[in-house]
Amino acid sequence: KGVAKENHYLLKMALYSELKKDLEVLPIYEILVQHYPKKRYWTNLSGLYGQKDRQMDQMGALEAAYDDRLLDKQREFTALSQLLFMFENPRKAAEVIEDGLNQGIVKREEKTLKAAAQYWHAARELEKAKPYYKQAASKSKEGELYVFLGQVHFSLDEFDQAEEAITEGIKKGKLKDEAAAYMLLGQINFENQKWESAIESFRKC
Protein backbone atom coordinates (compact mmCIF):
# COMPACT_ATOMS: atom_id res chain seq x y z
CA LYS A 1 0.00 0.00 0.00
CA GLY A 2 2.81 2.45 0.97
CA VAL A 3 4.73 1.78 -2.26
CA ALA A 4 1.59 2.27 -4.35
CA LYS A 5 0.96 5.58 -2.63
CA GLU A 6 4.49 6.73 -3.40
CA ASN A 7 4.13 5.54 -6.99
CA HIS A 8 0.90 7.48 -7.27
CA TYR A 9 2.79 10.71 -6.52
CA LEU A 10 5.60 9.77 -8.88
CA LEU A 11 3.11 9.13 -11.68
CA LYS A 12 1.48 12.49 -11.03
CA MET A 13 4.88 14.19 -11.21
CA ALA A 14 5.70 12.41 -14.46
CA LEU A 15 2.48 13.75 -15.98
CA TYR A 16 3.30 17.31 -14.88
CA SER A 17 6.78 16.96 -16.37
CA GLU A 18 5.27 15.78 -19.67
CA LEU A 19 3.11 18.90 -19.67
CA LYS A 20 6.21 21.06 -18.95
CA LYS A 21 4.68 22.19 -15.66
CA ASP A 22 7.79 21.56 -13.57
CA LEU A 23 6.94 23.97 -10.74
CA GLU A 24 3.53 22.27 -10.32
CA VAL A 25 5.38 19.31 -8.80
CA LEU A 26 6.63 21.36 -5.82
CA PRO A 27 3.65 20.59 -3.52
CA ILE A 28 3.98 16.90 -4.43
CA TYR A 29 7.62 16.92 -3.31
CA GLU A 30 6.53 18.62 -0.08
CA ILE A 31 4.23 15.66 0.58
CA LEU A 32 6.84 13.08 -0.46
CA VAL A 33 9.54 14.37 1.91
CA GLN A 34 7.12 14.08 4.82
CA HIS A 35 6.18 10.46 4.14
CA TYR A 36 9.09 9.14 2.03
CA PRO A 37 12.11 11.29 3.01
CA LYS A 38 14.52 10.08 0.34
CA LYS A 39 17.55 12.10 -0.66
CA ARG A 40 16.41 12.85 -4.21
CA TYR A 41 13.10 14.24 -2.97
CA TRP A 42 14.85 16.62 -0.56
CA THR A 43 17.42 17.80 -3.12
CA ASN A 44 14.83 18.19 -5.89
CA LEU A 45 12.56 20.11 -3.52
CA SER A 46 15.47 22.34 -2.54
CA GLY A 47 16.20 23.03 -6.22
CA LEU A 48 12.56 23.94 -6.90
CA TYR A 49 12.54 26.33 -3.94
CA GLY A 50 15.67 27.90 -5.41
CA GLN A 51 13.93 28.39 -8.76
CA LYS A 52 11.14 30.23 -6.94
CA ASP A 53 13.64 32.42 -5.04
CA ARG A 54 12.60 30.84 -1.75
CA GLN A 55 16.15 30.61 -0.41
CA MET A 56 15.18 30.03 3.22
CA ASP A 57 13.09 27.00 2.21
CA GLN A 58 15.84 25.92 -0.20
CA MET A 59 18.25 25.89 2.73
CA GLY A 60 15.75 24.12 5.02
CA ALA A 61 15.26 21.24 2.57
CA LEU A 62 19.01 20.73 2.08
CA GLU A 63 19.61 21.04 5.83
CA ALA A 64 17.01 18.35 6.54
CA ALA A 65 18.76 16.02 4.07
CA TYR A 66 22.12 16.84 5.69
CA ASP A 67 20.82 16.20 9.21
CA ASP A 68 19.58 12.79 8.01
CA ARG A 69 23.10 12.10 6.60
CA LEU A 70 21.74 11.85 3.05
CA LEU A 71 24.04 14.31 1.25
CA ASP A 72 26.97 12.74 -0.61
CA LYS A 73 28.11 15.27 -3.24
CA GLN A 74 30.47 18.24 -2.97
CA ARG A 75 28.02 20.66 -4.61
CA GLU A 76 25.38 19.75 -2.01
CA PHE A 77 27.72 20.45 0.91
CA THR A 78 28.97 23.71 -0.61
CA ALA A 79 25.45 24.87 -1.53
CA LEU A 80 24.16 24.21 1.99
CA SER A 81 27.13 25.91 3.66
CA GLN A 82 26.74 28.97 1.39
CA LEU A 83 23.03 29.23 2.22
CA LEU A 84 23.69 28.84 5.95
CA PHE A 85 26.33 31.57 5.76
CA MET A 86 23.98 33.81 3.78
CA PHE A 87 21.35 33.41 6.50
CA GLU A 88 23.88 34.33 9.20
CA ASN A 89 24.67 30.91 10.60
CA PRO A 90 28.44 30.82 10.00
CA ARG A 91 29.05 28.19 12.68
CA LYS A 92 26.84 25.56 11.06
CA ALA A 93 28.15 26.60 7.62
CA ALA A 94 31.67 25.87 8.88
CA GLU A 95 30.61 22.57 10.47
CA VAL A 96 28.95 21.42 7.23
CA ILE A 97 31.90 22.22 4.96
CA GLU A 98 34.35 20.78 7.51
CA ASP A 99 32.29 17.60 7.71
CA GLY A 100 32.39 17.30 3.92
CA LEU A 101 36.17 17.84 3.90
CA ASN A 102 36.72 15.27 6.67
CA GLN A 103 34.59 12.69 4.86
CA GLY A 104 36.48 13.25 1.62
CA ILE A 105 33.27 14.27 -0.15
CA VAL A 106 34.47 17.87 -0.49
CA LYS A 107 37.86 18.20 -2.20
CA ARG A 108 40.63 20.05 -0.36
CA GLU A 109 41.08 22.81 -2.92
CA GLU A 110 41.64 26.54 -2.50
CA LYS A 111 37.99 27.62 -2.73
CA THR A 112 36.65 25.01 -0.27
CA LEU A 113 39.45 25.51 2.26
CA LYS A 114 39.00 29.29 1.96
CA ALA A 115 35.26 28.87 2.59
CA ALA A 116 35.91 26.78 5.72
CA ALA A 117 38.39 29.40 6.96
CA GLN A 118 36.04 32.31 6.35
CA TYR A 119 33.05 30.59 7.95
CA TRP A 120 35.04 29.76 11.11
CA HIS A 121 36.46 33.29 11.07
CA ALA A 122 32.94 34.76 10.86
CA ALA A 123 31.90 32.49 13.74
CA ARG A 124 34.83 33.97 15.73
CA GLU A 125 36.52 30.59 15.97
CA LEU A 126 39.96 31.89 15.06
CA GLU A 127 41.88 28.78 16.15
CA LYS A 128 39.71 26.68 13.82
CA ALA A 129 40.07 29.19 10.97
CA LYS A 130 43.89 29.22 11.09
CA PRO A 131 44.72 25.81 9.57
CA TYR A 132 42.21 26.33 6.74
CA TYR A 133 43.62 29.74 5.85
CA LYS A 134 47.12 28.23 5.88
CA GLN A 135 46.14 25.32 3.60
CA ALA A 136 44.15 27.57 1.24
CA ALA A 137 46.96 30.15 1.10
CA SER A 138 49.51 27.50 0.12
CA LYS A 139 47.31 26.51 -2.85
CA SER A 140 46.62 30.08 -3.99
CA LYS A 141 48.51 31.99 -6.68
CA GLU A 142 47.80 35.24 -4.81
CA GLY A 143 48.95 36.48 -1.42
CA GLU A 144 45.54 37.56 -0.10
CA LEU A 145 44.92 34.47 2.01
CA TYR A 146 48.27 34.82 3.76
CA VAL A 147 47.17 38.34 4.75
CA PHE A 148 43.94 36.91 6.19
CA LEU A 149 46.02 34.31 8.05
CA GLY A 150 48.23 37.12 9.35
CA GLN A 151 45.16 39.02 10.58
CA VAL A 152 44.02 35.95 12.51
CA HIS A 153 47.46 35.49 14.10
CA PHE A 154 47.52 39.22 14.95
CA SER A 155 44.09 38.98 16.62
CA LEU A 156 45.45 36.13 18.74
CA ASP A 157 48.58 38.15 19.69
CA GLU A 158 50.75 35.67 17.77
CA PHE A 159 52.96 38.40 16.37
CA ASP A 160 55.84 36.29 15.01
CA GLN A 161 53.46 34.05 13.03
CA ALA A 162 51.51 37.13 11.93
CA GLU A 163 54.67 38.77 10.59
CA GLU A 164 55.65 35.60 8.74
CA ALA A 165 52.20 35.25 7.13
CA ILE A 166 51.88 38.92 6.09
CA THR A 167 55.42 38.93 4.68
CA GLU A 168 54.62 35.80 2.67
CA GLY A 169 51.42 37.42 1.39
CA ILE A 170 53.23 40.57 0.24
CA LYS A 171 55.93 38.43 -1.40
CA LYS A 172 53.35 36.32 -3.23
CA GLY A 173 51.69 39.52 -4.46
CA LYS A 174 48.47 40.30 -6.36
CA LEU A 175 46.97 41.85 -3.21
CA LYS A 176 43.74 43.82 -3.40
CA ASP A 177 45.11 46.36 -0.91
CA GLU A 178 48.88 46.19 -0.55
CA ALA A 179 48.96 49.39 1.54
CA ALA A 180 46.67 47.78 4.15
CA ALA A 181 48.99 44.75 4.28
CA TYR A 182 51.99 47.02 4.93
CA MET A 183 49.99 48.92 7.56
CA LEU A 184 49.26 45.64 9.37
CA LEU A 185 52.89 44.56 9.02
CA GLY A 186 53.93 47.88 10.57
CA GLN A 187 51.59 47.32 13.51
CA ILE A 188 52.98 43.80 13.98
CA ASN A 189 56.57 45.05 13.89
CA PHE A 190 55.61 47.76 16.38
CA GLU A 191 54.18 45.11 18.75
CA ASN A 192 57.39 43.11 18.32
CA GLN A 193 59.39 46.27 19.12
CA LYS A 194 61.07 46.15 15.71
CA TRP A 195 61.01 49.92 15.39
CA GLU A 196 63.00 50.33 12.16
CA SER A 197 61.02 47.60 10.38
CA ALA A 198 57.79 49.19 11.60
CA ILE A 199 58.78 52.62 10.20
CA GLU A 200 59.83 51.02 6.89
CA SER A 201 56.47 49.20 6.61
CA PHE A 202 54.49 52.36 7.42
CA ARG A 203 56.40 54.26 4.72
CA LYS A 204 55.23 51.70 2.15
CA CYS A 205 51.55 52.26 2.98
List the model feature ranges, each with a label.
Residues 1-204:
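Alpha-solenoid helical repeat scaffolds
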